[in-house]
């Protein structure tokens, strides 16, 4: 009896495999979105940069007026980098709220799950193969030992 045969199951559901290079596009921050947003620069509180962060207005807060979505960003000490990152975050939030196309984050999560499943399958197959080889070797060794004992008692 094969060991892995009893564990297999066949499903009629179609499995959609995701390719890393075929992910949905990242949401873009458009000039129309820019016109609908208000931007504030705040004194920072937490984040990298130490005392300098507490003294300057590097924290960016974007508010999308039609939806009321507010995004804050203080990932770096640079105001310009924070502005860029805040716009990317807002575009992602708007895409998630409108749900017009499949989310890139969901596709990435599914891709990671798919990779883990594949890795697990390979690992299980590898260890089953090792187990089978060890079992066969043990049976051969026992058969040789039995044959040796028979030879000894025949004499």
Swiss-Prot record:
Annotated stretches, region: Disordered: 111-155
Gene Ontology molecular functions: peptidyl-tRNA hydrolase activity; translation release factor activity
Protein name (record): Uncharacterized peptide chain release factor-like protein YLR281C, mitochondrial
Keyword Transit peptide appears in the UniProt entry: yes
Cytoplasm recorded as keyword: no
Sequence similarity: Belongs to the prokaryotic/mitochondrial release factor family.
Organism listed in the record: Saccharomyces cerevisiae (strain ATCC 204508 / S288c) (Baker's yeast)
InterPro entries for the chain: Mito_Transl_Release_Factor, Pep_chain_release_fac_I, Pep_chain_release_fac_I_sf
GO biological process, one term: mitochondrial translation
Pfam family, one: RF-1
Feature: compositional bias, Basic residues: 113-124
Transit peptide start-stop: 1-17
Main location: mitochondrion
